[in-house]
């Protein structure tokens, strides 16, 4: 197993969710047990010595690898959700996507000051959702957060928008 095999397992879907977008569909990679194991093992190896105590996953595809990564790292897992999906008091942030606008919320008691945080999402495009997630995490007085992606679309330069990221790592870059 290698990164070329992982890349080959990711389906390209043209004009989704709107014309002009080439959607990187990771569901085809996730359904293959060997590919899933390789991806999570590679991400684990990168973060295993960072002292991560909380992994924060962005709804919804960030939940898939984020929760597995939290388990492997012996860390807790925190959900960043769309509005109205979390039952307790939340912080909320609105942001722009490459194809519209959206919002994210996090429980106000999700992160402690002493936590070492890893933010995980499936894909970095323009950086809108990741930057919104970092803005939410800054409400917990975290000066810097590790940030992880399965895929980065480098031509969209989303990395430049990620304020407050300590270290940004993408396993695959297109």
Name each model-derived stretch.
Residues 1-174:
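PRPP-associated nucleotide enzymes
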């Amino acid at each position: 197993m290698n990164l070329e095999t992982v890349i080959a397992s990711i389906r390209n879907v043209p004009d989704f969710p709107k014309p002009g977008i080439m959607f990187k569909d990771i569901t085809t990679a996730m359904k293959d047990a060997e590919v899933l194991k390789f991806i999570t093992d590679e991400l684990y190896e990168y973060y295993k010595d960072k002292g991560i105590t909380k992994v924060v996953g962005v709804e919804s595809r960030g939940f898939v690898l984020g929760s597995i990564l939290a388990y492997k790292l012996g860390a807790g897992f925190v959900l960043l959700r769309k509005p109205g999906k979390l039952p307790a008091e939340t912080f909320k942030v609105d942001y722009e996507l490459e194809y519209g606008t959206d919002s994210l919320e996090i429980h106000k008691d999700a992160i402690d000051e002493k936590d070492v945080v890893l933010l995980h999402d499936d894909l970095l495009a323009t950086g809108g959702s990741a930057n919104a997630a970092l803005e939410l995490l800054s409400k917990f007085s975290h000066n810097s957060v590790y940030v992880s992606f399965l895929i980065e679309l480098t031509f969209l330069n989303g990395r430049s928008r990620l304020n407050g990221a300590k270290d940004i790592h993408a396993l695959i870059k297109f």
